[in-house]
């Protein structure tokens, strides 16, 4: 709820990107290696989204290309990028042989007819198929703080932390003529401070989620009854869904109860 997805999508508008210059992918557990790199669908050998954009960017070195991955922590980036992950921070250079790699399907492509081999390869060298990631292809991801990616993936990126914007939250509530907007924001701050300082396992809440409090107003104010309803219907389900599988139900329930006690005027 900190606006990560909105910021990612806004890049398309800000850069005035043509459809051919970007791919926007929202990950889920069903994504596989063949969806990003390549593989067989039935009897057809198909390029994945990332490989296809690598080829387009390589053939247009003066253009800018963007691969936008939303909800990156929903799937294993190591599995879906495969060998290509090592090239995220070693982009293609004609003088650098290590900027080319053989993927798990390169030997399959080598056996194709010449025309099909060229079509299925990012690059051909000495008649063999190679993968490369061009320098004019930018990869941007969003992921939740409580989820992790492997160090091998993490080191390829510059990380930008997105936090709850309490100013934006207060402006949003005031625009909806909620007269106790400042007091409501103070409660939200207290909850996130409690989560950061006192508990393990609960995730911090972003302003995008807290903006939902506007639906719980009564007579131009948000009363304690509204806070209670918001906590039960919005926050508690988020806490439970975001909790790791190692959490014991009892201890999680205790932490949620403690958080609820903080979410008060």
Please report, for each region that a protein language model flagged, where it lies by residue.
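C-terminal regulatory/interaction module of P-loop NTP-utilizing enzymes
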Residues: 1-265
